[in-house]
Design a protein with these regions (language model features):
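Glycine-rich, acidic/polar active-site loops that bind/position phosphate-bearing ligands
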Residues: 1-474
């Protein structure tokens, strides 16, 4: 919408903007924001920034926590969810220094930009295109409570199978039978369509939306391929728009990986490909599934580091309740064509050279997208730099349904981590590929791991309702 500070000022005048909102990202990948009256916004605001306390974002120690947020004019757009006319921008965080401020190397947006620069410096590629698939649930009612005498949750969705007939009109959605189901069974079409229109207005081209497998109200929105750093910004906006549009329709949206026991979990599969001088790096007519050796090495890097990557791509305890057999979620370290049981799937429909790619299927949207996408790029580049061949390392290709193998055959396969603690152990032991070129600071990784360890310990200490069912009367 705008590219320069002058264009932002012009937009404020022409649109009668009353407030200017600055959206920042914390260590968990959640928006925080600060708002100023538009009359106080000047071109100097774009260079001097807005001061904030970074210690509350999880980045800096309290003794050195004063930072400034520098808005990026290219991200300026009108926020459709504010009744008061509001212009919104995201941007980058800077450390206050003399004579010049310097970038906060722990800030997510700075990390994804540093990863892109590292890629260009290697000469391997100059652009990484990614396409995340956003799976989520829409609920009509959700509540939870964690107290000494009461621990539990409840949720409901109009089209959920446990509700049976809707309004006595024979509209029944079968359990696990929700995939691509049409009206009248698709009860949230208008809500999702408005989400996609809002995303398009925000400059995010959308490929499609549709009902997903989970009959309790699971859906998917898929954007088109985009440059990595821009897609990280877009990921934040897609979640923001999804949550706020759902509320407008009297519903609640969640990207939680496994909100419903016995139903399909929600992932964020990430398709990826590299370009150099506009030409595809991953295409080779003579390669397996028409992928080049660089593509295979990139996959090799992802597979070699997949255990440590899981701490970043699946950073919640709930993430690992999704990564179990039986729900089309990946559980095996390997690659294959058109095989959803392997963690890397090569889509057979991507036939043209500039579309040849693969998807990593384990990530979910509880991740910080800036950390996630940057980590995937760094792992893949490490694979290319060290020529890590996935076939030679025994990671496939697995052109069979891995879920149906015998127990003896499954025992030979390498599995994904089964808990966040295990993934954090792997990240502690294997993160040199992330710190190359100073892309991921050691201090950030230490604070991230420590915060997640505390999270794991806190979750483990809470009695679970299912424990009462199993152990109460022993």
């Amino acid at each position: 919408m705008a590219k320069t500070a002058q264009e932002v000022m012009q937009l404020i005048r022409e649109q009668g903007i009353k407030m200017v909102d600055f959206k920042m990202v914390d260590i968990n990948g959640q928006y925080r924001h600060v708002t100023i009256p538009a009359q106080n916004f000047t071109e100097a605001t774009m260079t001097d920034g807005i001061g904030f306390d970074a210690s509350n974002y999880g980045y800096a120690v309290v003794e050195k926590s004063d930072m400034v947020f520098i808005p990026d004019p290219a991200t300026a757009q009108i926020d459709p969810f504010c009744e008061v006319s509001t212009l919104s921008m995201t941007g980058n965080a800077m450390i206050i220094d003399y004579p010049h401020n310097r970038p906060l190397d722990q800030y997510p947006r700075n990390i994804v930009l540093a990863a892109e620069q590292y890629m260009r410096d290697t000469g391997i590629a100059d652009t990484m295109l990614i396409l995340p698939e956003f799976e989520f649930y829409l609920f009509d009612d959700v509540a939870w409570k964690v107290a000494p005498n009461e621990i539990g949750m409840s949720l409901d969705a109009e089209q959920a199978h446990w509700n049976g007939d809707i309004n006595g009109r024979g509209v029944i959605v079968p359990r696990q039978g929700h995939y691509h189901i049409a009206k009248p069974l698709d009860r949230t079409y208008e809500c999702r369509s408005e989400m996609c229109l809002r995303m398009e207005e925000a400059g995010i081209p959308i490929k499609y939306h549709h009902p997903e497998v989970g009959g309790a109200g699971q859906f998917e929105i898929e954007p088109k391929l985009g440059e990595m750093s821009k897609m990280a910004d877009a990921t934040m906006l897609i979640k923001y728009i999804t949550h706020n549009t759902a509320l407008k329709y009297g519903k609640s949206a969640t990207f939680m990986p496994k909100p419903v026991y016995g139903e399909a979990g929600s992932g964020m599969h990430v398709h990826m490909l590299l370009l150099k001088d506009g030409e595809p790096v991953f295409s080779d007519d003579n390669g397996y599934s028409h992928l080049s050796r660089e593509a295979h090495w990139f996959m090799g890097g992802l597979l070699k580091h997949i255990h440590s990557l899981c701490a970043i791509t699946n950073p919640s305890t709930n993430s690992f309740k999704r990564l179990v057999p039986g729900f089309e979620a990946p559980v095996t370290v390997g690659y294959a064509t058109s095989n959803r049981s392997a963690v890397i799937r090569i889509p057979a429909y991507a036939k043209t050279p500039n579309m040849r790619r693969f998807e990593l299927r384990n990530p979910d949207a509880t991740c910080n997208p800036y950390f996630c996408y940057a980590a995937l790029l760094m792992a893949g580049l490490d694979g290319i730099e060290n020529k890590i061949d996935p076939h030679e390392n025994g990671w496939g290709p697995y052109d069979v349904n891995l879920y149906t193998l015998s127990d003896e055959e499954k025992a030979k396969l390498q599995g994904l981590p089964t808990s966040l603690d295990a993934a954090l152990d792997a990240l502690e032991a294997d993160h040199d590929y992330l710190t190359k070129g100073g892309v991921f600071p050691e201090a950030l990784l230490r604070s991230f791991i420590a915060a997640k360890r505390r999270e794991c310990a806190a979750m483990a200490a809470i009695p679970h309702p299912a424990e009462f069912e199993r152990y109460y009367n022993l």
